[in-house]
Amino acid sequence: MKNITKYQGVIPAFYACYDAEGNISAEGVKALTRHLIAKGVKGVYVGGSSGECIYQHVDERKAVLEAVMSEAKGKLTVIAHVGCNNTADSVELARHAESVGVDAIASIPPIYFHLPEYAIAKYWNDMSAAAPNTEFVIYNIPQLAGTGLTMSLLREMLKNPNVVAVKNSSMPTQDIQMFKDAGIAARGEGNFVVFNGPDEQFVSGRVIGADGGIGGTYAVMPELYLAMNEHINKGEIEAARAIQYDADRIIYKMCEAHGNLYAVQKEILCRMYGLELGGVREPMPGLIPEDEPIVAEAQAMIEAAIAKL
């Protein structure tokens, strides 16, 4: 029986951290890790979309994970996204992730080419085989990856005993229920996890059965998601929904900027906590002077929402 309690709760997707020259900042990574530990989150999801994984080299992704683990080991659940645009690099990252002691590895499906399900299953299983003592999380994000997780593919992957979870970032919450049912059928009640992915519907996802959430805006306002999660655990749905509405309005505001959402969030973390995390890597657009009032208003909205808790 797997210990899935370590995956139940609020798990921020970890932001890419750069220095002034645009190189990986190990100090920034460590500072953000310490910050999230202090905030009381359950874990971190390293090297995913928020970590700008597809814009980083294999060695950079290893360096980020090593810096996270130097601070987080024994304190946070660490899930390392190891998917790359080819199997060899993905396998290398999977092997490295196991060597540094992560709790689980994860991967999106292969991107760009629309491959048959048996090829996707092999891609994932090859990574899992490279980290045989580490649990595996399927990352379903069809709107970006171009390929969605089907029930037949999930059932095939559940033949691998290391597959313990789906991180579901598709928009229909029904997918959470369907993936949960398939996991229970294969593993039994309490032995399979589904994470809610879309931050804007954390409450909806949790209510329909998600065990926790992994999200790209959690790190900039973890207090809100932790409070939502606590209210849901207590059955206080109206209170959770009110906080969800606040979080959603903040997300909408941040998305008004010319600069990418991650650039906005890292700037807010710098202003609120002095965390120097850098910008975003091109071709993602960085902040421009006209974004200043948007950043300032979003920060004020976060501070006001936290003050209401």
Residue spans for each PLM region:
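Active-site beta->alpha loop and helix N-cap motifs at the rims of alpha/beta catalytic domains
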Residues: 2-148
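Catalytic cores of TIM-barrel enzymes
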Residues: 2-6, 186-192, 269
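C-terminal alpha-helical cap/extension of soluble enzyme domains
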Residues: 6-15, 39, 210, 217, ...
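A general structural signal for well-ordered alpha-helical segments in protein cores
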Residues: 29, 61, 65, 90, ...
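Alpha-helical structural signal in soluble globular domains
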Residues: 39, 63, 67-72, 96, ...
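Short secondary-structure transition/capping segments
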Residues: 56-59, 117-120, 150, 178-179, ...
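Secondary-structure boundary/capping positions in well-ordered alpha/beta enzyme cores
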Residues: 75-76, 134-135, 161-164, 276
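Catalytic alpha/beta core domains of metabolic enzymes, predominantly
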Residues: 130, 142-248, 258
